Swiss-Prot record:
Binds 1 heme c group covalently per subunit. Belongs to the cytochrome c family. Keywords: Electron transport, Heme, Iron, Metal-binding, Signal, Transport. Gene3D superfamilies: Cytochrome c-like domain. Heme c binds at C34, C37, H38, M116. Residues 1-20 form the signal peptide. GO terms for molecular function: electron transfer activity; heme binding; metal ion binding. This is Cytochrome c-551. It comes from the Bacteria.
């Protein structure tokens, strides 16, 4: 009986989505810094967070190849995606902390640039967790 219960519990918890290591509620509040440039709109067109269109829609960003969603990205971000960059919580946090430095390191190109000038000094983990929660994706 104990063994059956352990198996059932293991299957239950392994089936649940695992979100980024951050605080979802804090991420929702911190996203206010992002919404001047970004929105969150589901694939079905549901507006989760009304925001700007200077940056790409961040719905489903975690798990997506960089530079591939419908948006005019900079050449270096597209090149990073073509080189295999797929957003997860860790590289998302590193990117939003210093987009230009991230791309320069990822591409090993000291001249790489990002169209995103804003640097998020803290709260990236929380924002990643929030984005994962509203997109139904895991990190």
């Amino acid at each position: 009986m104990t063994r059956t219960l352990a198996v059932v519990l293991a299957m239950t918890f392994s089936a649940a989505p695992v979100f980024a290591e951050g605080d979802i509620e804090a991420g929702e509040k911190a996203f206010n810094k992002c919404k001047s440039c970004h929105q969150i709109v589901s694939d079905a067109g549901e507006e989760i967070v009304k925001g700007g269109r200077t940056g790409p829609n961040l719905y489903g960003v975690l798990g997506r190849q960089a530079g591939t969603a419908d948006f005019r990205y900079g050449d270096d971000l597209v090149a990073a995606g073509e080189a295999g960059l797929v957003w997860d919580a860790d590289n998302f946090v590193e990117y939003v902390t210093d987009p230009r430095a991230f791309l320069r390191a990822y591409l090993d190109d000291s001249k790489a640039k990002s169209k995103m000038a804003y640097k998020l000094r803290s709260g990236g983990e929380d924002i990643a967790a929030y984005l994962a929660s509203v997109s139904g994706s895991s990190s």
